[in-house]
Amino acid sequence: MADRLFGTDGLRGTVNTYPMTVDVALRLGLAAGIRFRRGQHQHKVVIGKDTRLSGYMFESALTAGLCAAGMHVIMTGPLPTPAISFLTRSMRADLGVVISASHNPFQDNGIKFFDADGYKLPDMAEDEIAAMVLDAGFSWPYPDSRGVGRATKIEDAGGRYIVYTKNCFPAHLTLSGLRIVVDCANGASYKVAPLALEELGAEVFRIGTGPDGTNINEHCGSLHPDVVAAKVREVRADIGLALDGDADRLIVVDERGVVLDGDQIMALCAQAMMARGELPGNLLVATAMSNMALELFMRDHGGQLLRTKVGDRYVMEAMRREGAMLGGEQSGHLIFHRYSTTGDGLLAALQILRIMREKERPLSELAGLLTPFPQKLINVRVEKRLPFEERPAIGEAVAQVEKELGGRGRVLLRYSGTEALCRVMVEGEHEDRVRTYAEDLAQVVERELR
């Protein structure tokens, strides 16, 4: 049942369309409250959101359900997803809740949960919550009238997060003299990200810091790095930072205006952490989408790359299991486990800036250590989510491309965990061939899964 409700990053969909409706949100609040109401202590929940107009109504619905279940709710207002993870830990809350659809347009929204340690919930916990929500006849074990929770707002949540991120930056270093362009996507980081960088001494040029409820991710943020790249060239900045709507993802632009993806940043950070002795087992965790060049880079530098399913939660699960300190996704989710329990765009930016400060070299030189194989990713909108093996034509097309790549490339097909899309990725040594292979495969997928 849970697969009808939760995807790879919580619940997500179009506002006022199932499952992103107020009644589902109310039941989610009730179910999560009951699931995490354990023991006799005062039960607390931290709720944050991004800047979407619909965030207000979902915040109210979730709060009502949680309070009805006996949980005390602490509302932070708009804050990055990793800030809610941090506050859940630091405030000793039982649960953290984020209302956001990340990089999606404002018409969408989503709900995801963190446990008391600041980690995203495992599938089993989500299954238990979903079972209660989807059971129309479920008998809710309400507390008596004295056991109902109350809701309060916390006014200094953003300041607490800024202090936390600054404490993850070496005390003997500053950002004085650096010119930084930061694009906050008119999202959750619109206040905290520029302030944190300015307090560390940087000269900050702001983009996407005027949210109006409907302009989140609109021609800005991590999905539009060309915007920050143009600004970097215009103001001759040292680096550009593009965050997504909930600021758990980061895309970086060097001083020339060249966009660097998550793989290039992971290579840079892994090398620095290995040199500092901060990467246990010289292990980096990434997903199936990461470029083959990253795998070869780690091997050539005495390290190893462990691949997981796509989704930063699966990266984090593998990091916990293996004791890894660095992991991430090509899309820009970067996890520094020494400091955080989830992807954090601002924290990742500070780790990159630390390397720039310590090396005193431009980012273009530092990031040049990884040359990715040409890779083409095509998103195909689909009506059916059938197992690929049930469509022989797809398997035959994949086999033909793999044969032509001759072991010097990869083909990956996967369904999006949050949208009605099939992602077709081809990687190889020759850009023109890679593009042709991907386009041909995408046509087959579209035809077979309509």
Curated annotation (Swiss-Prot):
Pfam families: PGM_PMM_I (PF02878), PGM_PMM_II (PF02879), PGM_PMM_III (PF02880), PGM_PMM_IV (PF00408)
Family classification: Belongs to the phosphohexose mutase family.
Cofactor binding remark: Binds 1 Mg(2+) ion per subunit.
Organism: Desulfovibrio desulfuricans (strain ATCC 27774 / DSM 6949 / MB)
Gene3D superfamilies hit by this protein: Alpha-D-Glucose-1,6-Bisphosphate, subunit A, domain 3, Alpha-D-phosphohexomutase, C-terminal domain
InterPro entries recorded: A-D-PHexomutase_a/b/a-I (IPR005844), A-D-PHexomutase_a/b/a-I/II/III (IPR016055), A-D-PHexomutase_a/b/a-II (IPR005845), A-D-PHexomutase_a/b/a-III (IPR005846), A-D-PHexomutase_C (IPR005843), A-D-PHexomutase_C_sf (IPR036900), A-D-PHexomutase_CS (IPR016066), Alpha-D-phosphohexomutase_SF (IPR005841)
Taxon lineage: Bacteria, Pseudomonadati, Thermodesulfobacteriota, Desulfovibrionia, Desulfovibrionales
First-level EC class: isomerase
Residues the entry annotates as binding Mg(2+): S102, D244, D246, D248
Example of a GO biological process term: peptidoglycan biosynthetic process
Catalytic activity, as annotated: alpha-D-glucosamine 1-phosphate = D-glucosamine 6-phosphate
Function: Catalyzes the conversion of glucosamine-6-phosphate to glucosamine-1-phosphate.
In-chain residues carrying the UniProt-annotated modification Phosphoserine: S102
EC number: 5.4.2.10
SUPFAM superfamilies recorded: Phosphoglucomutase, C-terminal domain, Phosphoglucomutase, first 3 domains
Transmembrane intervals: none
Domain of life: Bacteria
Cofactor(s) required for function per UniProt: Mg(2+)
Alphabetical list of PANTHER family matching this protein: PHOSPHOGLUCOMUTASE (ALPHA-D-GLUCOSE-1,6-BISPHOSPHATE-DEPENDENT), PHOSPHOHEXOSE MUTASE
UniProt name for this protein: Phosphoglucosamine mutase
One MF term in the entry's GO annotations: phosphoglucosamine mutase activity
Residues at the catalytic site: S102 (phosphoserine intermediate)
One of the record's GO cellular component terms: cytosol
Keywords annotated in UniProt: Isomerase, Magnesium, Metal-binding, Phosphoprotein
Post-translational modification (record): Activated by phosphorylation.
